[in-house]
Amino acid sequence: SDGSDVAEMYDDFVYTPTNGLLGAYWGQNYAIIYQCNEILDAIAEKETAGQTETEDIINKGEASFFRAYCYFNLVRAFGEVPLVTYKINDASEANIPKTTADKIYEQIDKDLKTAEESLPETWSSEYTGRLTWGAARSLHARTYMMRNDWNNMYTASTDVIKKGLYNLKTPYNEIFTDDGENNGGSIFELQCTATAALPQSTVIGSQFCEVQGVRGAGQWDLGWGWHMATEYMAQAYEQGDPRKNSTLLYFRHSDSDPITPENTNEPYGESPVSPAMGAYFNKKAYTDPALRKEYTNKGFWVNIRLIRYADVLLMGAESANEKGIPGEAIDYLEQVRARARGTNSNILPKVTTTDQGELREAIRHERRVELGLEFDRFYDLVRWGIAKEVLHAAGKTNYQDKNTLLPLPQTEIDKSKGVLVQNPDYQ
């Protein structure tokens, strides 16, 4: 089974501490953290012995980045979690109580500062996809954003903007295509591939498309159909916004349904068939049929775009507005809207209001449509303090205040023999 019932459980906010995916998410993040700890401890020993080389400095930056990235995943999802920053020689050494979220963020700040100081601004094409200063600084901005720390969020995001390393030259409808990989607006992108020898490998590829692909049969068995969009989301787009058709994948419910322009998707002219109950699949996980035939329907070769320059511009806009610098906020916002608008001057007019409240709503709207189905909408609602209001309006009435965090995996609590304490209201 691919766990369609599990997807519905999370979508309806009725998950429990015993759900297996909680343990998997927790365990995978900590596995990476422990690997980073080993690398950093080994480099520290070389530093003490005065034997560090240039590659050690870069490796230190990369390991620090990934440790921060994983702790950010954990603190956003679970809140207080154990903070382990040393090599684990025995499992008992990791059996420690939860650390406050503030302390976790202190470690994240420390690690990202190390990454920023250690990583280069660019790499040669031979090393496409390796971590850079821009990735570290952009992730730092995102962590400040989650804390609504406007001053540090502004400094970090505008540091990246002012460097001029990234651009929005790639049209929006090409960003998530095969040709759009590692484009000028991609700051942090996981590199995945497929080969004739390993056409369906998750070792060198990813499940990004498989998890979100069309849930159908035969040629339309493209994935599990998780992370579907709603009509509520479709209605959020302004009239004529081309990002709608680049984000929402239209489909028919059966082969007997007619193929119409409204359910046909560019650029491949396909009208998938699925019995799914959601309104739209994620078009950002939609793959080229020619590559499906060569490798597999599941799209393991597709890179995962994790931080885009448009996101950084919107972080700059949001923090500038909150700091009372509307002109700068409008400029960053307009750069994002201008790329989406393209040559069609009749759509997406420039936002000109300098009223802080109105501009705040415009920026929030832009985050929703520019970054639609890219993982962070829920966390935006949480940090803005409007999650319950928005989710209830969308029909998700099971959502309660406790759902700002996930429950700790019951398996981890059991293994700790009571050292770990469950999050409030899940006990």
Placement of each model-derived feature along the sequence:
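Conserved, well-structured interaction surfaces
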Residues: 2-78, 93, 99-102, 112, ...
